[in-house]
Amino acid sequence: MDIRKAYLDFFASKRHEITPSSPLVPDDATLLFTNAGMVPFKSIFTGEIPRPNPPRKTSCQTCIRAGGKHNDLDNVGYTARHHTFFEMLGNFSFGDYFKEQAIAYAWEFVTEVLKLPKDRLYITVHENDDEAFNLWQKHIQKERIYKFGDKDNFWQMGDTGPCGPCSEIFYDQGQEHFNSSEDYMGGDGDRFLEIWNLVFMQYERSANGVLSPLPKPSIDTGMGLERVTAIKEGKFSNFDSSLFMPIINEISKLCNKTYVYESGASFRVIADHIRSSVFLLAQGVSFDKEGRGYVLRRILRRALRHGYLLGFKQAFMYKLVDIVCDLMGGHYTYLNEKKDSIKEQIRFEEERFLSTIENGIEIFNEELKNTKEIFSGEVAFKLYDTYGFPLDLTADMLREKNLKVDEEKFELLMNEQKARAKASWKGSGDKTVSGDFKNLLEKFGENHFVGYEKAECESKILALLDEDFKEVSTLKDAGWVMLENTPFYATSGGQSADSGFIAKREVLDTQKFFNLNLSFIKAGEELKVGTIAHARIDAEKREQIARHHSATHLLHHALREILGSHVSQAGSLVESNKLRFDFTHHKALSKEELESIEKRVNEMIINSSEAILENMPLEEAKKSGAIALFNEKYQGNVRVLTLGESKELCGGTHVKNTAQIGSFYIVKESGVSAGVRRIEAVVSKAALEFVKNQLEGLSKAKDELKNNDILSGVKKLKNEILSLKNELKNSSKTELDSKNIQGVEICVKRVDNGDIKAMIDDFKNKFAKAVILLIQVKDEKITLAAGVKDAPLKAGALVKEAAQILGGNGGGRDDFATAGGKDLSKIDEALKQSLETIEKAL
């Protein structure tokens, strides 16, 4: 049975609009990942945006719980139901139906569609929710309905805001299988399994804790697909269901070991973690040192360590991508499109970690010998800092030994490292925004962007806000303006904001806050709420931005055409004088590839294709072949831009014809993170300036080289440098005088020119037995080097002794060592002491 489809079809038949799963990276700064089905609708529940039409929605939402407040990572593999990635089935009502229908729908689906036995079902309600208790009695005997308090049956989004009682449906897995002391309704055992939570959002909690009834209560429900699939298939663990067993069987085949549930935690960890890795990578998250990318790295490295326990010594996770795509690509079709790119990124990250995992485990095992209860925080930090072991990976390894890590010491060292990094950081552009945008929305609704058609207009000032986003009636200082109709494009989709003027006040920036388009203005003449003002954008700047933005679309198309369909946009920045485009690709681009891409973009520009803009429903746009971006949130109708062969969803401003772009030049190609590359480029006037600068640079090079043929001039210069280096090297050989003691040639000397390492090598090659120590001063920096050949001394000890006299330190091998010093006044003393040490040893 396809439970996912059955659920969505059922609620569609109840007049719910099916909403596609939102991105795992939410449009919510407070969340690391989308971790519940209601997250995409949060701003509707809180009243920040108006209720949708229709007011009923249903979805199967992909979710991640690994990192942040909701973090199940440590438990995955050791329990029957914890996952880093899961799918949440949900139905939602925004001020439409309430408890009676929500309960009736849930009961109908569970008993008539899933056909779960009624005698296995139990219900919980809030202890004060008599309404829900009575409604449930229409479907089930009251002896099967249990009342619990706030801890179990009251839901709230935060300390303030919408909240309400909830009701849960439980499934009895059978007394014959579960009979511990905790296996009762309300206990911590596994016999009674919660399968569906119905939240009745009927109150608003104020800052002082008072609950006030909402005028239009709402419904938010959630049912885990993995859990209900296991129940429907008669399995006691989600991992034994058809969603996971094909992956586990593939792991078993790859490692040539049989999966046994009791000892199979490593199989389960890998099966879970490959699902989350595939989905995160498919949606544009890349392996990184921080943020979401670091959570992804932790997930994969935890799986690799468990693979190591199963005997995998080479990359193997990438081989599991196919089975995940086979299982889930039918519903999430983008997985198949990204499959090759996902494999490459996983393989690259695997090989990177596998090169250090063995050394890291050796260090872990050495420290384990000295550990009684608490593992050293210093060693845990070393494992993290040097060998790439996330703390939770070390903790996971210790868990198997019933030990813990000194997290306090680890965090102390981590904070010290962060402080050092912060000290070298120049600052941040981050700013906390705390304005009453909900009030503005209620008063005025969303204001209108008219900038697609107009560069200037007369418009009413709806609201004025100071720099701290507090509403004011008049404004002379710098602050924010909300116009009824605005020609100013707000920073969005990588495109930078317009600038210009409102009245005589200069507009420096325009941003969107909860779909309100607000412009930031410099201090100047007084503006008043309710008056009409003339708004005018900087049309020349807009035109240059549009040219660069259209070029990113052509670049994206060229990249996919030349490198492959695995390429997808991972970020962009569009300004009036440059563009930056990040994209998924597993390796640096060759000179030939860059030349082909640049040439292809210029061909599309020369083709003079008209820009075609269309508005259509999202699903229709996708069917037409338009490319949508995962990190963008699309609602209702979408704007589709066709530029020649390129077709993408985009809300930005663009040229009317590709010929207006002028010409396109790639300035730089670089890596952003594992699996993500970046191209920086220029078009139009910026391209002309780039070419002009290149030509000026070549002209200056000709003048400096005194040669019109630059390549010939550079070659000649390189030959001269090589000749001078050889002369210097040869001259250094003749500068060293020495004496012989007991058949050993000795040289202790200060030399301020030449390569002292080369001098020492030459000296040692010249004699059968030799000891040499040289001190060199350059730019008041002291360098020492010593060499020993077939003599009873160690170069490391010799150079260390001399360096300490000079206020420095150093060391090295027995035959060669280097050091540094600080005190120039003690060079003679150091030379004298070194000579005495050598003579004594001989």
Swiss-Prot record:
SMART domains for the chain: tRNA_SAD (SM00863)
Subcellular location: Cytoplasm
UniProt-recorded name of the protein: Alanine--tRNA ligase
SUPFAM superfamilies referenced in this protein's UniProt entry, alphabetically: Class II aaRS and biotin synthetases, Putative anticodon-binding domain of alanyl-tRNA synthetase (AlaRS), ThrRS/AlaRS common domain, Translation proteins
Cofactor requirement: Zn(2+)
InterPro entries named among the record's database cross-references: aa-tRNA-synth_II/BPL/LPL, Ala-tRNA-lgiase_IIc, Ala-tRNA-ligase_IIc_anticod-bd, Ala-tRNA-synth_IIc_core, Ala-tRNA-synth_IIc_N, Ala-tRNA_ligase, Ala_tRNA_ligase_euk/bac, DHHA1_dom
Comment on bound cofactor: Binds 1 zinc ion per subunit.
Enzyme Commission numbers on file: 6.1.1.7
Species whose genome carries this gene: Campylobacter jejuni subsp. doylei (strain ATCC BAA-1458 / RM4099 / 269.97)
Protein family per UniProt: Belongs to the class-II aminoacyl-tRNA synthetase family.
Domain notes: Consists of three domains; the N-terminal catalytic domain, the editing domain and the C-terminal C-Ala domain. The editing domain removes incorrectly charged amino acids, while the C-Ala domain, along with tRNA(Ala), serves as a bridge to cooperatively bring together the editing and aminoacylation centers thus stimulating deacylation of misacylated tRNAs.
Entry-linked CDD domains: AlaRS_core
Superkingdom of the organism of origin: Bacteria
Any one Pfam family match given in the protein's UniProt record, by short name: tRNA-synt_2c
Entry GO CC: cytosol
GO biological process, one term: negative regulation of DNA-templated transcription
Annotated catalysed reactions: tRNA(Ala) + L-alanine + ATP = L-alanyl-tRNA(Ala) + AMP + diphosphate
Alphabetized UniProt keyword annotations: Aminoacyl-tRNA synthetase, ATP-binding, Cytoplasm, Ligase, Metal-binding, Nucleotide-binding, Protein biosynthesis, RNA-binding, tRNA-binding, Zinc
Function noted in UniProt: Catalyzes the attachment of alanine to tRNA(Ala) in a two-step reaction: alanine is first activated by ATP to form Ala-AMP and then transferred to the acceptor end of tRNA(Ala). Also edits incorrectly charged Ser-tRNA(Ala) and Gly-tRNA(Ala) via its editing domain.
Binding site for Zn(2+): 549, 553, 650, 654
GO molecular function ontology, one term from the record: ATP binding
